Amino acid sequence: MRIILITGISGSGKSVALNALEDAGYYCVDNLPPRFLPQLASYLAEDGQDRLAVAIDARSSASLDEMPAMIRDLSRAHDVRVLFLNASTQSLIQRFSETRRRHPLSGSTSHDADVGLLTSLAEAIERERELVAGLAEFGHQIDTSNLRANVLRAWVKRFIEQKDSGLVLMFESFGFKRGVPLDADFVFDVRTLPNPYYDHELRPLTGLDKPVIDFLDALPVVHEMIHDIEKFLVKWLPHFRDDNRSYLTVAIGCTGGQHRSVFIAETLAARLASSANVIVRHRDAPVEAGESSKLVA
């Protein structure tokens, strides 16, 4: 059975990810107390289910301490993958304010004595970060601070389409003006390259459009940058694989995350597709009008 565990910070998009998995045919359970996970997996396997997705939050903090060992045990019999969703505190506060939902640890005394009384939203968020921090190392971390809900759904779809084993390598384009992604393992700054933004015909386009591709592809300095990044990754990917790393996020940043970083992320992904399970995400590139720009808890 393939088991996908969705955890992380409340408000970072766990419900969006779980809904995407349900649409993909997974048996989904939200807010399952972690101690019941092995029994649920066994029951569903006996019942013929082959795909399970479970969202876990910090309300059962005592059980969270048991999760690392539980994940290792489950991995012996099942294909277990962990998605750890994160976001900046500022983004989370804004989302809870917009949706008028209460944080699970905010405003009341938890049944867990370790949590106690948390009166402010910011305090609850920081406490939750402490409670779930130990799970981050088991899965792929994704920063949803500037991520639209439709983009997260598409990313989850690509994630579950990856092969059962091997290193998952994600290339993430972004704009420095909106901050560096929290989930990045490596960050490459390509702002020194010529910027298509200053060509008025190219300005409204992205690095996925042929005119921008042709513009950047004609510049030797762009190919030098791509070659150097590729050479670095080709050298070090085997070491990460030998270290049992399952996920590696390579962030490519330009000023706005629209032209140069998008083109280079796509090019690197194509070149390294045979070396790892590759996923591409464009955090800040414009999307079609009308798509949702909000995530829910």
From Swiss-Prot:
Binding site for GTP: 57-60
InterPro entries according to UniProt: P-loop_NTPase, RapZ-like, RapZ-like_N, RapZ_C
Pfam families attached to this UniProt entry: PapZ_C (PF22740), RapZ-like_N (PF03668)
Residues reported in the UniProt entry to bind ATP: 8-15
Any coiled-coil regions, as ranges: none
UniProt keyword Metal-binding present: no
Keywords of the record: ATP-binding, GTP-binding, Nucleotide-binding
GO MF annotations, alphabetized: ATP binding; GTP binding
Function recorded in the entry: Displays ATPase and GTPase activities.
NCBIfam families, per the entry: PRK05416.1
Protein family membership: Belongs to the RapZ-like family.
Protein name: Nucleotide-binding protein Bphyt_0592
